[in-house]
Amino acid sequence: ANGLKWRIKMYDYLVVGSGLYGAIFAHEAKKAGKSVLVVDKRPNIAGNIYTEKQEGINVHKYGAHIFHTNNKKVWEYITQFAEFNRFTNSPVANYKGELYSMPFNMYTFNKMWGVVTPEEAAAKIEEQKKEITGEPKNLEEQAISLVGRDIYEKLVKGYTEKQWGRDCKELPAFIIKRLPVRLTFDNNYFNALYQGIPMGGYTKMVENILDGIEVRLNTDYLEHKEELDALA
């Protein structure tokens, strides 16, 4: 009536992007009995957590991703789709051939000064922090006021200058709000109870999440908006 055309759409939902958010929404919608179409402008699924096999190694194409959470329900949910290894992120900084544990913890301080108790480490840091009096005028002074000169010179300065492309004395103090210091022998980067990387890579995990769901790759939603909006 009234000249209106009723068009039955092919899908209940159109999901743009096949990263974790889009893939999990699509999975849950399908589980609830809805029909879903997923489109992604990239030639692969999994968004920024995409991994691909090179020489038998799962390479993280868009930077390293380590899954970590304290939420048991989240962990139980995600492990339906992949078995996770027990990878624990324990970074090490190389300063002129000396290896230092990151984030700053008792292993770092022991290597730096030979201290063995939290009290000794705290006293050393406090003593060095006193070098800066008054309001820090630049990033160098800010870092020294937080962790002292030794840690700044060996573990903050070079990395920060490489990151910003300029001298720490030329960078504003507000860039570094705080530098976490742990007075424990703990070099676990995350404090999360559950952490790891899916065996077989993230792409395989997202494939499992999207099982039975139609996915169109190399499809930019903005370029095909009208056609895709007519479908869902």
Feature locations, PLM:
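Short, Lys/Arg-enriched N-terminal segments with co-localized hydrophobic residues
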Residues: 1-9
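Active-site/ligand-binding neighborhood in enzyme catalytic cores
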Residues: 93-100, 106-231
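N-terminal glycine-rich dinucleotide-binding loop that anchors FAD/FMN and/or NAD(P) in oxidoreductases
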Residues: 52-77
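Conserved beta-strand segments of alpha/beta enzyme cores
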Residues: 35, 58, 83, 214-216
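Glycine-rich FAD pyrophosphate-binding loop
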Residues: 30-55
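N-terminal Rossmann-like dinucleotide/flavin-binding domain of flavoprotein oxidoreductases
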Residues: 68-72, 76-80, 203-213
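A short alpha-helix-loop-beta-strand transition element characteristic
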Residues: 74-96, 151-154
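N-terminal Rossmann-like FAD-binding beta1-loop-alpha1 element of flavoenzymes
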Residues: 11-38
